[in-house]
Amino acid sequence: MSQPITRENFDEWMIPVYAPAPFIPVRGEGSRLWDQQGKEYIDFAGGIAVNALGHAHPELREALNEQASKFWHTGNGYTNEPVLRLAKKLIDATFADRVFFCNSGAEANEAALKLARKFAHDRYGCHKSGIVAFKNAFHGRTLFTVSAGGQPAYSQDFAPLPPDIRHAAYNDINSASALIDDSTCAVIVEPIQGEGGVVPASNAFLHGLRELCDRHNALLIFDEVQTGVGRTGELYAYMHYGVTPDLLTTAKALGGGFPVGALLATEECASVMTVGTHGTTYGGNPLASAVAGKVLDLINTPEMLNGVKQRHDWFVERLNTVNHRCGLFSEIRGLGLLIGCVLNADYAGQAKQISQEAAKAGVMVLIAGGNVVRFAPALNVSEEEVTTGLDRFAAACEHFVSRGSS
């Protein structure tokens, strides 16, 4: 008989790069989770915007089990039917002509940045290598992507960092214009900065970046790892803005909880990549591809995407009610089901404490820095789950405020 597992085992056995909650979830269904003691939680964290269809969705389980009974992996020396079907679905649904599959958002962004450098080198010469990114962005944890992220706290311990990466102020087209020139190979931007505080880009900002990239022959990369696959009420957030990127990265919700990432590219951009220029052992794995294909089937429908917009209204209405009672937030912002509640000055820096109180009350939420409580629930979360979860969140907020004033 195996020994019981406890939260303390994490501190004993794991490299301490995370500080997980004091409870261990063991079972989930829809937007509910239960821990080892049987306590129920309403899940508004969604695995950090990953569990787009909740936990243990029956059609995703069926897709996974069906493929698992056939074969699991062959490597990139062979292709497979699920990955080709998935590629065609993404191409048909977006601007893209070609797809590269990998295992995570960081890998997708790494591939995009490498492709952009190679595209510029092949077309214009090695002098055209500059990458412009944005302060407070997050693009992953590889050395290249963490350098592009523009958050020194994540990169400062790993110098020397890759060169020729500069950071402009987000939503400031004049700041970006001062950095983008003929030596720039790419601009990478999140349509909504997720980890940076749930900050949506302005329409003028993204249109301005498209114009600057066209003027200077630079590729425009949209990092849609967090905003993609229905999260904002469109399949991808670029569709809200009417700005088409040259490259788009996607992951998180694409697998509905199964690890998968992808780089979407135009034919012109993809043409510079040849056999051996990039790759990954697990990319396009048939298990991941079978699940992701079913995720797209379920999410890319008018009913689901319109439902995300409706659920946004449920959340914002109820969060405003919570705020009227507690007075915690200066702003509630975001698109679709990526929502950030910005703490006012009296509670600055205490988002983590609020998330901990929420967990005690039986609801899981995220943070986006010290000042923003973030919600990224399942796209199919029910109205009952929203009501129950936000009632628990309200109780947590009231307890937090009363504790602070006592």
Swiss-Prot record:
GO molecular function terms listed in the Swiss-Prot or TrEMBL record: identical protein binding; pyridoxal phosphate binding; succinylornithine transaminase activity
Pfam families (UniProt xref): Aminotran_3
CDD domains linked to this entry: OAT_like
SUPFAM superfamilies: PLP-dependent transferases
Stored InterPro entries: Ac/SucOrn_transaminase_bac, AcOrn/SuccOrn_fam, Aminotrans_3, Aminotrans_3_PPA_site, Class-III_PLP-dep_AT, PyrdxlP-dep_Trfase, PyrdxlP-dep_Trfase_major, PyrdxlP-dep_Trfase_small
Residues modified as N6-(pyridoxal phosphate)lysine: 252
Family: Belongs to the class-III pyridoxal-phosphate-dependent aminotransferase family. AstC subfamily.
Cofactor(s), by name: pyridoxal 5'-phosphate
Keyword Transferase: yes
Pathway named in the protein's UniProt entry: Amino-acid degradation; L-arginine degradation via AST pathway; L-glutamate and succinate from L-arginine: step 3/5
HAMAP family per record: ArgD_aminotrans_3 (MF_01107), AstC_aminotrans_3 (MF_01173)
Reaction catalysed by this enzyme: N(2)-succinyl-L-ornithine + 2-oxoglutarate = N-succinyl-L-glutamate 5-semialdehyde + L-glutamate
Organism: Escherichia coli O7:K1 (strain IAI39 / ExPEC)
GO biological process, one term: arginine catabolic process to succinate
Keyword Coiled coil set for record: no
Function comment: Catalyzes the transamination of N(2)-succinylornithine and alpha-ketoglutarate into N(2)-succinylglutamate semialdehyde and glutamate. Can also act as an acetylornithine aminotransferase.
Name of the protein this chain belongs to: Succinylornithine transaminase
UniProt EC number: 2.6.1.81
Keywords assigned by UniProt, alphabetized: Aminotransferase, Arginine metabolism, Pyridoxal phosphate, Transferase
